[in-house]
């Protein structure tokens, strides 16, 4: 594969991840599966849903969820610094989500939905440690932020040999948890394969076989090959919430359906629950296989920072460290 093709796939992964997140957010965190699926299974265009169904917070259509927003912060950091710098990334993260920002607003499950963006509790706790300079400031929980936010890092460092180390550093800023790190590293290796080699039906098997043996591989393999289930049923089976391994298993199951970008994102939307991080992952994996032309231009235009992320992704793709 030519260098230009790899750069386009890196760009596609970034844009595909963030656009998928924005397309999903109006129906993020809807856990009444029966009602939700009945309403959406026959809806031909569930993306950017005009009715905001998220029961936890209200925000503008086309904006990013907390998962996409972390992805965006990392993207901006990498472009502005021409690479990853842990201290500068921690500073940028704190400035974006910390005191005085739109995310630093009272939120209580007794008063829902909140008006404005949501900040997960483990992020709030991590911010307190970031301020002290702790490089492993994250909370010890296994959460889906780990893989949902790192696509720009993979796009920049695919093929460099530095990916595992940088992924661990980024993840432990918010999630100082081994399962979170290993999940993110596997997500990164699979995305790296797609960026460097394009479509490959054997990609998952190859990456899994080359991944160091640990206790999580069977969980990923089980979900990926669970072809008898629809993605909606797989999400119910493995877990529709934000925790790992279930959230990641739902994303793996979806990417093995061999659907195009639009169909994959729509499938993820219709499966409900904590679907924004799954959309981030699926959007990156699928867009990296098909290239930037697979992402509908009208989806990009409906994303509030669509043009900005395209420009950042273009700049980052020219800085790939391979």
UniProtKB/Swiss-Prot annotation:
Top-rank lineage group of the source organism: Eukaryota
Pfam families linked to this entry: ADP_ribosyl_GH
Keyword Protein biosynthesis in record: no
GO MF term (any one): structural constituent of eye lens
UniProt entry keywords in alphabetical sequence: Eye lens protein
UniProt record similarity statement: Belongs to the ADP-ribosylglycohydrolase family. J1 crystallin subfamily.
Protein's name in the database: Crystallin J1A
Organism the protein comes from: Tripedalia cystophora
